[in-house]
Regions:
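Short, low-complexity, polar/charged sequence segments that are solvent-exposed and flexible
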Residues: 22-25, 77-80, 91-94
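An N-terminally biased module of ancient metal coordination in phosphate/nucleic-acid-related enzymes
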Residues: 1-68, 87
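Glycine/small-residue-rich loop that forms an oxyanion/phosphate-binding "nest" at active or ligand-binding sites
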Residues: 59, 72-83
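Glycine-centered loop/turn motif at secondary-structure junctions
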Residues: 31, 96-97
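Histidine/acidic residue-rich metal-binding segments in metalloenzymes
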Residues: 48, 83-96
Length: 97
């Protein structure tokens, strides 16, 4: 079984404070095997993390702002447009695989 945190924000997100490197260091210190960086409406934190040498599996993800609230999308490589109706956003995520 993997010890995983699937909802982490970095300073690439409007509400995150820790750099990507700080997040990865904290994940290692906490004994996590995997994390998903799910910054708001951007995948920049994930893109930075995938370039770093780390023992933590970094799952691609994003927290998408919709008209009705937020949706977490995992396993996609590009973020869909934000600010859309939630059902349209879910469809866009499904279409990305």
């Amino acid at each position: 079984m993997l010890s995983t945190d699937l909802h982490i924000h970095t300073s690439c997100s409007k509400d995150g404070e820790s750099s990507v490197q700080q997040v990865l260091s904290a994940a290692i210190a906490a004994g996590l095997d995997a994390i998903a960086i799910t910054d708001h409406d951007t995948m920049q934190g994930y893109k930075i993390a995938r370039e770093l040498d780390t023992s933590v599996l970094v799952i691609p993800g994003v927290e998408i702002s919709t008209r009705e609230g937020h949706v977490i999308a995992l396993g996609i490589e590009t973020a869909p447009n934000h600010g859309q109706p939630v059902l349209d956003t879910i469809k866009m995520v499904q279409d990305k695989g």
